[in-house]
Amino acid sequence: MQYQLLINGVLVDGEGERQSVYNPATGEVILEIAEASPAQVDAAVQAADNAFAEWGQTTPKARAECLLKLADSIEQNALEFARLESQNCGKPLHCVINDEIPAIVDVFRFFAGAARCLSGLAAGEYLEGHTSMIRRDPIGVVASIAPWNYPLMMAAWKLAPALAAGNCVVIKPSEITPLTALKLAVLAKDIFPPGVLNVLFGRGQTVGDVLTGHEKVRMVSLTGSIATGEHILRHTAPAIKRTHMELGGKAPVIVFDDADLDAVAQGVRTFGFYNAGQDCTAACRIYAQRGIYDALVEKLGNAVSSLKMGAPEDESTELGPLSSLAHLKRVTAAVEEAKALSHIRVITGGSQTEGKGYYFAPTLLADAKQEDAIVQREVFGPVVSITVFDDEDQVLRWANDSRYGLASSVWTQDVGRAHRLSARLQYGCTWINTHFMLVSEMPHGGQKQSGYGKDMSLYGLEDYTLVRHIMVKH
């Protein structure tokens, strides 16, 4: 397959600097791709702006039909997408096939249906002789910046609602993991009118800044780090652009002494280490009540140490590599900083593995304190800390003592306690006796420095619209 940009309905080679794309399981170069030039970024935005005049006025049915065609096409090419995602990200192939591709297809299908249900409210007569109506209209050109942890899924989360609402999109995947987005461009070319969906490739400083700063971009949607979010907000502030930010998390997992510890251990084994822990909602910050602390540490140690690392194509592999050498170094530095603290116990893991690729052993760090960096900062790797707490008030205070506010979970058999905690936790989502469960019908998004705006659900669709008041005199 030839990897090209999609600009105004045409696949073209990039005209900028060539960048290497790596296989993180081996550390080897997969291929080189040329970035978009500033002129190509401008051409993509101009094409989107021109296409918006017609696409923004199409019927919801017409937009839905395009989204359904794209969903069908992804499903028909599922194995190729899965292989590309696995090769480029190091994900276990069976996880991409069984978990991610079906969810991606479902997102496009959900928003195809949601597009036909979005409407304004008939507000009625609030002034004598005048009738008011509320419209929800598309915004215009949306610049979408997708991350490297779930390249195709995050592209789907951004593209589906934006296009369903009638916007035109220019999307830039991460330069680390662009392959599935560029494959998606090949399919989209024959489904959407020229200019409605444009796909670029390049780094943030060479392509992203030009894209988000373009005068005709009306909205910027980012999934990335807090630092990247801050940069984009500063960069776009002079033009007062609308923004949609999902900027990471440090999910507290609150385990009370009446919890099912086997379920907790299995849950953390799965939900703390899926995708090598490179997930904003990962179950990575455990608070265990004193009465069950030692027992939970033992169970978690056994569970985490049993995770099988290996080649992505191996059916038995549960944990693949980290996405890049630079990220492996960041995770290693965070764990080494924690290990240097005298009170930290390394129950299992704690270092990168020998051999090829960017692998880091699944790690459990016990006896962490609330003020430790390993508790306060997002590591974004296969690393889980566990901290002891005494009572409900203390753990609520500690759980909320974070700059992040994306996801959390509470493990207890006490229904009243579950409701009390979920009402007071400062997180966009709180799961009870589970973690990491996402469905297209429900919103995903954070508060505090985890960002704002919702992905998925009707709330996600509304985020890509403008509320307008129409008043008719009669």
UniProtKB/Swiss-Prot annotation:
Q: Which residues carry out catalysis?
A: 246, 280 (nucleophile)
Pathway as given in its UniProt record:
Amine and polyamine degradation; putrescine degradation; 4-aminobutanoate from 4-aminobutanal: step 1/1; Amino-acid degradation
Recorded hits in SUPFAM superfamilies, A to Z, give:
ALDH-like
* E.C. number: 1.2.1.19, 1.2.1.-
Q: For NAD(+), which residues are the binding ones?
A: 146-148, 172-175, 209, 225-228, 280
Which example biological process does GO assign this protein?
L-lysine catabolic process
Q: Which family does it belong to?
A: Belongs to the aldehyde dehydrogenase family. Gamma-aminobutyraldehyde dehydrogenase subfamily.
Q: What is the recorded name of this protein? A: Gamma-aminobutyraldehyde dehydrogenase
Phylogenetic classification of the source organism:
Bacteria, Pseudomonadati, Pseudomonadota, Gammaproteobacteria, Enterobacterales
